[in-house]
Amino acid sequence: MDLKGLIRDIPNFPKPGIVFRDITTLLSDAEGLRYTIDTLTEKCKAANLSPDYIVGMESRGFLFGVPLAYQLNAGFVPVRKPGKLPAAVHQVEYELEYGTDSLEIHQDALNNHHNVLIVDDLMATGGTAKATADLLEKIGCNVLGFAFIIELKALEGRKKLPNLPIISLVDY
């Protein structure tokens, strides 16, 4: 199936010179959505990735992470931006091109030695994925790898995620 054909390009969004890869058209296509989840599942199994939990990155990682967790018989845990989780959290701060940001996870969501797979819709520079992995490793999790729908190859995000399996379905 041509997943790239189901992803809409929006030029000059969110700012001039950027081409936004809009997955809402993929999500609204029942066959494409099923194919996406089935293919992620197959690739995880082929790579012998058996997570206890799927960790979905805010917010589109939730859309693909929950059905993947179901398919892999794993739990699902969200990683969110600050102030979005109601209970006590672990937090990590990370560098952006012009400043810093942070991510949070509930303190009681995961324990030491849980095997986790990090899922998001898109990998660009790899900064947020790396920060998520750092947060999970800080609390004692074993990060098995990453799964993305889209990878923007020119931004070389893989360089920030060495020595871990990375699954991506569509390259730009």
From Swiss-Prot:
Pfam families cross-referenced by the UniProt entry: Pribosyltran
Organism ancestry: Bacteria, Bacillati, Cyanobacteriota, Cyanophyceae, Oscillatoriophycideae
Keyword terms: Cytoplasm, Glycosyltransferase, Purine salvage, Transferase
Gene source species: Crocosphaera subtropica (strain ATCC 51142 / BH68)
Pathway info: Purine metabolism; AMP biosynthesis via salvage pathway; AMP from adenine: step 1/1
EC number(s) recorded for this UniProt protein: 2.4.2.7
PROSITE patterns assigned to the protein according to its UniProt record, in alphabetical order: PUR_PYR_PR_TRANSFER
Top-rank lineage group of the source organism: Bacteria
GO cellular component, one term: cytoplasm
Disulfide pattern: none
Role this protein plays: Catalyzes a salvage reaction resulting in the formation of AMP, that is energically less costly than de novo synthesis.
Reactions catalysed: AMP + diphosphate = 5-phospho-alpha-D-ribose 1-diphosphate + adenine
Catalytic EC class: transferase
Main location: cytoplasm
InterPro entries (alphabetical): Ade_phspho_trans, PRibTrfase_dom, PRTase-like, UPRTase/APRTase
Gene Ontology biological process terms from the UniProt entry: adenine salvage; AMP salvage; purine ribonucleoside salvage
MF-aspect GO terms: adenine binding; adenine phosphoribosyltransferase activity; AMP binding
Annotated signal sequence range: none
UniProt-annotated location(s): Cytoplasm
Protein name as it appears in the record: Adenine phosphoribosyltransferase
Entry's family note: Belongs to the purine/pyrimidine phosphoribosyltransferase family.
Subunit structure: Homodimer.
Keyword DNA repair: no
